[in-house]
Amino acid sequence: MMRGTPQMPEAIATRKYFDREFDRQAIKLLPNEYYVTAEDVVLTTVLGSCVSACIRDEVAGVGGMNHFMLPDDENAGADRMLSTSMRYGCYALEVLINELLKMGARRERLEAKVFGGGAVLANMTTLNIGDRNADFVLKYLRTEEVRVAAQDLRGPHARRVSYFPRTGLALVRRLTRQDDTVGIEREERALARALSTSTKAPARGAVELFTRQTTARIPT
């Protein structure tokens, strides 16, 4: 159920740079961040067990991305601090959709593409964080009646996602051991440690995929 969620400036991605590969400004999202825009930019992030939802309204010309770590916070009360809850998909998706609506998007026109939910580390398989995130994002969007146009979820690999909100194009690179996955593995181990010491574990189209060896394009 959508609520009146305020904008969260502290959670808006601020890492901007010029991407020479795509010849345009890029915004890099870290975990617990989101970004919405009407500009012709590329939004990028790297995912392990985390999930990103890329949502846009083609008619309104606005789109955005988020990056969340866990499905839901069942222990959160009504007085929760939203600025510390963007790690949870329930809040991250709520904020993203509400910000798009504020920019002129219409709920019935929203289109989503979702990525991530990988089991990057062997010891993470028992926690099923990636699977839970993947299940959650699909269930949430179905409940909110947001059409999922494409998905690349689960599996044993990390992903680098580049999303163009103006056109809806999503490029997904499935990272291999030859790619730089050190940062991802560090984050996954930290998440695994945090969950293993917690008294409560979290509750249970069209994409272009490319690796260093091969590139496959599926029409958008």
UniProtKB/Swiss-Prot annotation:
Probably deamidates glutamine residues to glutamate on methyl-accepting chemotaxis receptors (MCPs), playing an important role in chemotaxis. InterPro entries: CheD-like_sf, Chemorcpt_Glu_NH3ase_CheD, Cytotoxic_necrot_fac-like_cat. It catalyses: L-glutaminyl-[protein] + H2O = L-glutamyl-[protein] + NH4(+). One of its GO terms (biological process) is chemotaxis. Its EC number is 3.5.1.44. Keywords: Chemotaxis, Hydrolase, Plasmid. This is Probable chemoreceptor glutamine deamidase CheD. The keyword Secreted does not apply. GO terms for molecular function: protein-glutamine glutaminase activity. SUPFAM superfamilies: CNF1/YfiH-like putative cysteine hydrolases. It is an enzyme of class 3 (hydrolase). Belongs to the CheD family. The keyword Hydrolase applies. It comes from the Bacteria.
